[in-house]
């Protein structure tokens, strides 16, 4: 497993609409392998893996992470911020963050906020300034992006910890598929899509799908269980138990034919799956499957612990198994298979 790649993706700072640091990593890989690259109007990256007269398949992961944006600067030097995406309440107080300025300078600071019961409001970043002028002299302006200042780390037992695993694990899988299959003979035309602005309303998933117009889509994302050490029967997001296959969420109910086919392929190659359902929230799959006249879509990905906060934990074996399964699925998506998956008679 390429931990240096995962580290680079995790430590890149990219809230919605400001995803250049992640985009650049993907573009360097595509350019190195001389792949065709397109963009939608929001900045999503569309990489054409191969040419084929077969069906068109889209593998999608989003580039953006939850974070904050500078709203205003007080006379005393407090930097007021607003959340971008659903940052956990517990992660809105006393967290190390960094502000990326318009000149791409990184300014460290401490995030804090006012707690009222379970709610945290009036969030601000303290960079040690004593006045608005000192903040401005540091190059900070309203609109600058703020992300958690988290270093990627390798943990015991093949596990890793870092920020933005939602959804840099998916972006990592896009790159590994690009490397593995860049010169393979495939039955389908495959597009690897890194979408923009998922955390603020599934935006890039919709525009990118319009650009690709796929016959089938696989959306890569992550999720965690509310109680990290609950290993009960209801928890299908346990790290180390294999990738998640999301049967339903608030925005998408996966087609049974598609999920059954994936389960069959996973069994053939010995990859365990966790059949999961989201009681709250959704993914790009909600936008993807409603594009055009409708796209058969499924959501998959490695489970994590501690989502939408300063750091998450994942199991490298889950990531590798997800890569293995994606490769097998892509190599089996023939025209006949797609016809069977989309036959409603």
What are these regions (language model features)?
Residues 1-345:
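N-terminal hydrophobic/helix-forming segments and targeting peptides
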């Amino acid at each position: 497993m390429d931990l240096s790649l995962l580290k680079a993706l995790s430590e890149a700072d990219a809230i919605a609409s400001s995803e250049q640091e992640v985009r650049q990593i993907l573009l360097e890989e595509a350019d190195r392998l001389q792949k065709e690259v397109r963009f939608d109007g929001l900045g999503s990256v569309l990489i054409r893996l191969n040419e084929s007269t077969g069906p068109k398949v889209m593998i999608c992961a989003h580039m953006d992470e939850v974070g904050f944006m500078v709203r205003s600067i007080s006379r005393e030097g407090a930097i007021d911020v607003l959340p971008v995406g659903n940052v956990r309440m517990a992660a809105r107080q006393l967290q190390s963050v960094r502000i990326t300025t318009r000149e791409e300078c990184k300014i460290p600071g401490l995030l804090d906020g006012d707690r009222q019961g379970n709610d945290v409001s009036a969030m601000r970043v303290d960079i040690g300034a004593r006045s608005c002028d000192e903040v401005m002299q540091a190059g900070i302006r309203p609109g600058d992006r703020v992300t958690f200042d988290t270093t990627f780390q390798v943990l015991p037992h093949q596990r890793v910890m870092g920020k933005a695993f939602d959804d840099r694990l998916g972006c990592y899988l896009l790159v590994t598929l690009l490397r593995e299959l860049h010169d393979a003979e495939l039955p389908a035309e495959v597009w690897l899509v890194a979408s923009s602005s998922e955390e603020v309303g599934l935006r890039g998933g919709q525009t990118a799908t319009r650009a690709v117009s796929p016959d089938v889509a696989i959306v890569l994302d992550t999720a965690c269980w509310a109680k990290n050490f609950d290993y009960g029967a209801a928890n299908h997001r346990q790290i180390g138990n294999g990738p998640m296959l999301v049967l339903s969420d608030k925005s998408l109910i996966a087609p049974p034919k598609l999920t059954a086919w994936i389960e069959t392929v996973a069994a053939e190659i010995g990859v365990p799956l966790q059949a999961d359902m989201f009681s709250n929230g959704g993914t790009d799959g909600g936008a993807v499957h409603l594009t055009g006249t409708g796209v058969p879509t499924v959501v998959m990905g490695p489970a994590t612990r501690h989502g939408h906060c300063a750091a998450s934990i994942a199991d490298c074996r889950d990531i590798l198994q997800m890569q293995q399964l994606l490769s097998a699925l892509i190599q089996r998506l023939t025209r006949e298979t797609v016809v069977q998956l989309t036959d409603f008679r």
